[in-house]
UniProtKB/Swiss-Prot annotation:
Residues 564-709 form the JmjC domain. Residues 116-139 have a biased composition (Polar residues). This is Bifunctional lysine-specific demethylase and histidyl-hydroxylase NO66. Residues 83-157, 187-208, 261-446 are annotated as: Disordered. GO terms for molecular function: 2-oxoglutarate-dependent dioxygenase activity; histone H3K36 demethylase activity; histone H3K36me/H3K36me2 demethylase activity; histone H3K4me/H3K4me2/H3K4me3 demethylase activity; iron ion binding. Belongs to the ROX family. NO66 subfamily.
Length: 888
């Protein structure tokens, strides 16, 4: 047992391997690994060989296929050549047979000078394969296999002259065949060179369809003529090879008998007639040879009414909501096709990142519950009457002016002159009724354009006595009617949104319409991106699809038909009444009043949810549009100074306002209000957005004011020019913000004291900063809309408008900025100004102070009468002054 246990213990005990055994084991495994490596290399080699063989088989297969295709192509070409040769032989045989028949029918009308041998050959139908025939006059003639000919000496003047007299086309690409890309040119009316390549009667359907005659409506001869038979100018009938003369006069084919008849009257001249060749496909359209010309049986001529009827069947039904009149069928452009119905908009999520109440409570603004003021609940005294015709409105307007002028007892002559001018407008003619012809011609553009009718003309006095600020206020009252401007600024301005609903669809139609847009695009050079934007908003993605170049009317309506929204920038440049609205309102707001027009097809949305940096007035002119307004996402977005990017729907909360604007309604919302709008499935939308008060906040004033205050303080106070302490970097800075020390507190207090002591602006500095904002307005503003009554009054004087001029300049000279001569485009030119001496400034200030009252030139606060007249003349020449009485 001990011996067994000893062996067991020896077997279980860990054995220490020797160096020799270790080397044996390593050698064994190395041989085994080498064997496996060789096997793997052999397998890879076999795989490469198999892949190479497979690739070689594929290459050979492709080569065999290419060779087969090449052989098939060669066989097809041979078959095509054989078919073409057969067709040529068949055509030549038909031509010979036709000549034989003609010779039998008209033996008496054969050409003079032809020998009896030639006539006998024609009667017997013998073919003369290109051999020369001796004529009786000693000349030779070659009989053709086909009827096409080449004339080099004008021997067909009797036929060709009639052809040219009855045809009217040019030699440019705008001729009747310009649709095929070819042109026709000739230099001699009596000499035509017809190509030797004839046409073939063997056309398949594809050829007939591809080579439809573009000249059918230009060349309509005798519709009762029998197909296959035609007559020349001498009354001789001859056969046609299947085409009709009514389709194209170049399809005439002259047979030998007709040639002889024509030559008998013009003299016996040698004529060379080339044989006919088979037609080839894919050749350019040859007007002389009628290549690619379909036969009459395959391409019958249709009248113009039939063509229009056929085109009308292919066109889609016009959109029921499209206000544009249908275009003629020849334009090949659908007026305003409706896009296919899009899926309904996704519902607004119930949750948002920041609730509207929190946002508005933090800023101190009132709740953003939108107020609605329906017109049927309030008196509508200021609403414009419904217009049945433009002449009635002009009559009413003129009568109002006449009545008001008659009430002014001190200006009876003035009223009579105005009455004459207005009667001239009333009849829509330009006959002069008094001696104001020169003044009226000078202001022809202003007087001929019909004015905006707001319905409140009776409430004002004579135009030349009105304050331009009050005129702007009246225009705002017309927009917000029945809400007054006082109520609007007290309850809604920069606080809440406001909707005015009125059941008057035509309330704003005088501002813009589809027809006005179409005329504007046709008559003016509007550019994409500069004047027109084409946008879409689908599946949460907003795209701008602006091409390059001019925005043509067909392109715009094409985009509209595809479901794109059209945004027209600065439309007031081209629409007089909209320009009058904007230029009048800018007098009240003392800032640029811009306008954009948005045209949206049914069931579409052109822009993603966003907010703007302007006070927005949305004027719904036509159609319907659903508007949804949301609270500003953050506190810093309330009354935002810059526009936002595009928001996703899930980033917005529930809308504060969700309603539909109808034609005649108006919606106001402050800057910073997130909004989006979408049209209904069967309703388009045309609306105007008036933008007001952009960059008109206290922040803008301080941005102009504080740099000048700091500059002046640095110049006058030594404390601001002293150096900073050496240890400031050790105690102040972002890295030291959490550490408190005596040095840090001392530096903070001293900096605050410097600001409070030296950076407080003076009144003069505030005045100068406001003048800078006024200067910016003079540059941006639209030129004033001059009424006919104002254009006559240009030695009491007053400023033409309250909001100009704006003083500015240097010490030695002052600049008076004005916007009378501004371009209609936004900031197109540099600001307009005139320079005056500092001693002349009191005269300008006096005119600004007494506005809108008139002031005698002699009362201007200047020392000498010459200086008064000089200043008044300079202002009047620039259009800044208006006289109390009109010039005669």
């Amino acid at each position: 047992m001990d011996r067994i246990s000893a062996y067991a213990a020896y077997g279980l005990a860990p054995k220490k391997t020797s160096k020799r055994s270790t080397m044996k084991i390593a050698k064994h495994f190395s041989k085994k690994n080498a064997k496996k490596t060789k096997e793997a290399m052999a397998a890879k080699k076999e795989a490469r060989k198999a892949a190479a063989k497979a690739a070689l088989r594929e290459v050979r297969k492709l080569e065999r296929k290419a060779a087969a295709d090449k052989a098939a192509k060669i066989a097809a070409d041979k078959a095509a050549d054989k078919a073409a040769a057969k067709a040529a032989a068949k055509a030549a045989k038909k031509a010979a047979k036709r000549e034989k028949n003609i010779a039998k029918k008209q033996p008496e009308k054969s050409a003079a000078g032809v020998t009896e041998n030639v006539q006998k050959q024609l009667e017997n139908g013998q073919e003369n394969n290109g051999t020369l025939i001796n004529l009786s006059n000693g000349k030779q003639h070659q009989k053709p296999k086909a009827a096409k000919m080449s004339s080099s000496n004008g021997s067909f003047s009797g036929i060709d002259s009639d052809f040219l007299n009855s045809s009217d086309f040019g030699s440019t690409e705008d001729s009747f065949m310009s649709g095929s890309g070819d042109s026709f040119d000739y230099s001699n009316n009596s000499d035509f060179d017809f190509d030797s390549d004839g046409d073939s009667n063997d056309f398949d359907d594809s050829d007939a369809a591809a080579s439809s005659c573009a000249s059918c409506e230009y060349f309509d001869m005798d519709s009762n003529m029998v197909v296959g038979q035609e007559s020349d100018t001498n009354g001789n009938s001859y056969m046609h090879n299947g085409t009709t003369q009514s389709e194209d006069q170049f399809t005439e084919e002259y047979t030998l008998s007709s040639i002889f008849n024509s030559t008998s009257s013009s003299g016996a001249n040698p004529i060379k007639v080339e044989p006919r060749k088979a037609a080839k496909r894919n050749e350019p359209f040859d007007l002389n040879n009628n290549k690619n010309k379909p036969t009459a049986a395959k391409q019958p001529k249709m009248s113009l009414k039939q063509e229009q009827a056929q085109v009308g069947k292919q066109r889609a039904d016009p959109a029921p909501s499209c206000p544009l009149p249908p275009r003629p069928s020849k334009t090949m452009i659908k007026s305003c096709p409706l896009p296919p119905k899009a899926p309904a908009a996704k519902p607004v999520p119930n949750k948002c990142r920041l609730s509207s109440r929190e946002s508005l409570t933090k800023t101190g603004a009132k709740s953003c519950r939108l107020s609605s003021a329906p017109a049927d609940k309030m008196a509508n005294k200021m609403a414009a009457p419904s217009r049945k015709s433009s002449s009635k409105n002009k009559n009413n307007d003129n009568n109002n002016i006449d009545t008001n002028n008659k009430k002014d007892a001190n200006n009876k002559k003035d009223a009579n002159n105005n009455k004459d001018i207005n009667n001239k407008k009333d009849a829509n003619n330009n006959k002069d009724t008094n001696n104001n012809k020169d003044n009226n011609n000078k202001n022809k553009l202003s007087s001929n354009v019909s004015q905006l009718v707001t319905g409140n003309e009776k409430q004002r006095g004579p135009v030349h006595l009105e304050n331009s600020i009050e005129e702007g206020k009246r225009m705002l009252n017309w927009l917000l009617n029945p809400i007054t401007s006082e109520t609007f600024f007290e309850q809604y301005w920069e606080r809440n949104a406001c909707q005015v609903k009125r059941k008057q669809p035509n309330y704003f139609t005088q501002l813009i319409s589809f027809q006005m847009i179409d005329e504007m695009l046709i008559e003016n050079q509007l550019e994409f991106t500069t004047n027109i934007d084409v946008t879409t908003y689908k599946k949460g993605v907003r795209q701008t699809l602006n091409p390059v170049g001019r925005a043509m009317s067909p392109a715009i309506w094409g985009y509209y038909g595809d479901g794109c929204s059209i945004r027209i920038l600065n439309p007031s440049t081209y629409l007089p009444k909209l320009r009058q609205l904007c230029s009048t309102m800018q007098e009240f707001f003392h800032c640029l009043v811009g306008a954009n027009v948005y045209l949206t097809p049914p069931n579409s949305q052109g822009f993603a949810p966003h907010y703007d940096d302007i006070e927005a007035f949305v004027i719904q002119v036509e159609g319907r549009k659903r508007w949804r307004l949301y609270a500003p996402p953050h506190q810093s977005d309330v009354l935002a100074r810059t526009s936002s990017g595009n928001y996703k729907q899930e980033e917005l909360g529930q809308p504060l306002f969700d309603a539909v604007l109808e034609a005649g309604d108006i919606l106001y919302f402050p800057r910073g209000t997130v909004h989006q709008a979408v049209t209904e499935p069967k309703q388009h939308s045309l609306h105007i957005t008036l933008s007001v008060y952009q960059q008109q906040a206290y922040a803008n004033l301080l941005e102009v004011l504080m740099p000048s205050v700091l500059e002046r303080a640095i110049k006058h106070h030594l404390s601001l020019r002293r150096g900073l302490p050496l240890h400031i970097w050790q105690h102040v800075g972002l890295a030291k913000g959490g550490q408190q020390s005596e040095q840090r507190d001392q530096l903070m207090n001293s900096t605050k004291q410097l600001v409070q002591r030296y950076l407080v602006p003076t009144e003069a500095q505030i005045d100068a900063a406001v003048d800078q904002l006024a200067k910016r307005f003079q540059h941006e503003a639209l030129p004033p809309y001059i009424k006919p009554e104002e254009s006559m009054r240009t030695t009491k004087v007053r400023l033409l408008r309250r909001q100009h001029p704006a003083p500015g300049g240097r010490r030695q000279q002052l600049r008076v900025y004005y916007y009378v001569d501004n371009a209609l485009e936004y900031c197109k030119n540099e600001p307009n100004y005139m320079e005056i001496q500092p001693t002349e400034a009191p005269a300008v200030e006096a005119l600004m102070t007494t506005y809108p009252a008139y002031l005698k030139v002699g009362k201007l606060p200047l020392r000498s009468a010459d200086r008064r007249i000089e200043v008044a003349t300079a202002l009047w020449e620039r259009g800044l002054l208006m006289t109390e009485k009109p010039f005669k």
